[in-house]
């Protein structure tokens, strides 16, 4: 087991990793920007090193500064968390070159699964169903028109090297394709340095289902069930739950087995997530992409499976084999996560940085967890993602979990900044959400228009 690890991240995920490491008896090193000097993760870690100014490009994305901090503090491994450098194969390679273990998959696997075109080809080889679409990269609007004509409208344009909802456009008809292609390609070029696109047929109505996997260095792979992440705004998740009420036992076994095949086919190591689209009309599921890191929503899986995913990441990276077999994984109850963001729903969810003057995080009762890194008097910097907390609940069944989440959101108090807490409470209280009557289009096309009219 490692003696000391460095956490190359900030916010609640850095705090989450520090806590897991401490419970394993491992010393921790936090890195921080000048904007995060008073951040909670710097106070909880055994050591803290400043790596640059507030802008992420000069600090949390500064590979040389992070590796220098790791060498200086004699850290044996680096946990990248999510976002920032977590899926950067160059960073993983450079860690290896200086003799520091990257807590995640190899750079080779990141390159294969991080490129949507390569990942699609790999899944076809592994007998994992893929969405009908282009066979490779599409570089011009003319090529896109030809592919769309072949697979049929509506289509989804996606950046080959994309993620986080960037470089994605839904196109309903041929007349709109050229403009959408040019906009999405430019966005992809600006965000990822690669303007190549690919096309997929739109699956509608659909559920966004993702499967959590764990893989050790000996080639053993298991899955921990699925998460339903269908409630999304601008292709970014708002609320997640596990298990999905849209999936029965037979389909759960099939989609879990497909996720394991996907991971095995590339020699995957550590925690990862395979994302699928479930066609509710036919019951068929299709591979979308693989996230080669821990997910924001990993706590819902931890609640229903009883497995500490972050601890397993550290154990696997240290060379320990998985102690769990697939038959050991029994999902119990139902878990839901709501993301609490410093943003203003009344102004198109504009970020709301500032100083938190008063804070009460819900607590009490069985099956309630709040992952956060904020405290009274803390100033939210304007440079980073707006998420400030995650509320996660676990109940005997879905209704129990929904009621518990409503109670938790009702108790939550954050003053000094505007948050989406009331929006989340309205969403979780909506009769259609309570009934499970929603798909990936529900939030944007059904719930939000009426919500904004009400506001």
Annotate each PLM feature:
Residues 7-24, 48, 71-73, 96, ...:
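ATP-dependent carboxylate activation and anion-phosphoryl transfer catalytic cores
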Residues 135-148, 241, 314:
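A short, flexible low-complexity segment enriched in Lys/Arg and Gly/Pro that occurs
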Residues 147-156:
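Acidic/histidine-enriched active-site and ligand-binding environments that engage anionic O-linkages
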Residues 34, 54, 108, 136-139, ...:
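Short, solvent-exposed coil/turn elements at secondary-structure transition points
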Residues 29, 79, 101-103, 131, ...:
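Structural detector of well-ordered beta-strand residues that form the stable sheet scaffold
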Residues 47-49, 111, 129-137, 168-169, ...:
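Structural signal for short hydrophobic segments within the conserved structured cores
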Residues 1-125, 138-146:
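ATP-binding N-terminal substructure of ATP-dependent carboxylate-amine bond-forming enzymes
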């Amino acid at each position: 087991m490692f003696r000391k690890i460095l956490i190359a991240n900030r916010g609640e995920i850095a705090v989450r990793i520090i806590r897991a490491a401490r419970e394993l008896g491992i010393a921790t090193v936090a890195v921080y920007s000048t904007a995060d000097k008073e951040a909670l993760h710097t106070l909880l870690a055994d050591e803290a090193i400043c790596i640059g100014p507030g802008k992420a490009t000069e600090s949390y994305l500064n590979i040389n500064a992070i590796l220098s901090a790791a060498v200086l503090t004699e850290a044996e491994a680096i946990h990248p968390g999510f976002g920032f450098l977590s899926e950067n194969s160059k960073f993983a390679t450079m860690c290896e070159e200086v003799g520091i273990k990257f807590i995640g998959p190899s750079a080779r696997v990141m390159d294969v699964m991080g490129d949507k075109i390569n990942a699609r080809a790999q899944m076809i080889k592994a007998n994992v169903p893929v969405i009908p679409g282009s066979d490779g990269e599409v570089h011009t609007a003319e090529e896109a028109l030809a592919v769309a004509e072949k697979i049929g409208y509506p289509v989804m344009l996606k950046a080959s090297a994309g993620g986080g909802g960037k470089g994605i456009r839904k196109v309903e008809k041929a007349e709109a394709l050229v403009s959408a292609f040019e906009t999405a390609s430019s966005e992809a070029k600006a965000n990822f340095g690669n303007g190549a696109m690919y096309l997929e047929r739109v699956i509608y109505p659909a559920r966004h289902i993702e499967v959590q996997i764990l893989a050790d260095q000996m080639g053993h792979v298991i899955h921990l069930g699925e998460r339903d992440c269908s409630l999304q705004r601008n292709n970014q998740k708002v609320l997640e739950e596990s298990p999905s009420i849209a999936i029965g036992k037979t389909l759960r076994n099939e989609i879990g087995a497909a996720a394991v095949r996907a991971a095995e086919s590339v020699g995957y190591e550590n925690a990862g997530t395979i994302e699928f689209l479930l066609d509710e009309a036919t019951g068929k599921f299709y591979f979308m992409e693989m996230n080669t890191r821990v997910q924001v929503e990993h706590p819902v899986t931890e609640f229903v499976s009883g497995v500490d995913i972050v601890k397993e990441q550290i154990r696997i990276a240290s060379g320990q084999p998985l102690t769990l077999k697939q038959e050991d994984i029994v999902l119990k109850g139902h878990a839901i996560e709501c993301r609490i963001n410093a943003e203003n729903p009344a102004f198109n969810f504009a970020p709301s940085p500032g100083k938190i003057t008063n804070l009460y995080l819900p607590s009490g009762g069985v099956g309630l967890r709040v992952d956060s890194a904020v405290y009274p008097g803390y100033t939210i910097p304007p440079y980073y993602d707006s998420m400030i907390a995650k509320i996660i609940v676990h109940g005997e069944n879905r209704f129990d979990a929904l009621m518990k989440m409503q109670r938790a959101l009702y108790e939550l108090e954050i003053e000094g900044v505007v948050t989406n807490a009331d929006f989340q409470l309205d969403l979780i209280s909506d009769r259609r959400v309570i009934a499970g009557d929603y798909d990936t289009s529900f939030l944007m096309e059904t719930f939000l228009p009426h919500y904004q009219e009400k506001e």
